């Protein structure tokens, strides 16, 4: 069971968003998560990272698992009094200055931009920095929750190309259909508290979602009649 645990002593119940989830990630899998808003896609991602405690069951990581995780809320954890250069340097104190500067240049922080205060950055610049910190750690499993929000067109295309050439495992939540088409080769559908393989493409999912919404409207009208 995946969801949010009620607080002890306040009488609140566990909020179960996903139930009886049984998934296996194989090396090289490239999976896009599809599902209505609020169905539990982000909950699944957080549970796989270990950020969200399982309500029931267990998570069994591989021996050499190295997770790279990006979600919009991580922008808030950036040290706004620091710089992109220092953020990377903290991760790898022995890395050379030139190595760090070359790496950051690939994410748009060229020259003096690598030494600008994060507090002065736009949402897009902060998103680029957060993605750079994920990439620097060389993960073999990428868990990405709406990574293109705030990114301009150039950086979206750069991210798409980087993910397409990434040799590890990818699980991606995104409304960017171009990104999904270019970087994943299978889909899981998250709906009705379940996570299941979706045998179809994005057009098939659009048809499924439209039919679901129409059925929901009919049910709603029936209740009001």
PLM features: what roles do these ranges have?
Residues 1-225:
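ABC ATP-binding cassette signature C-motif
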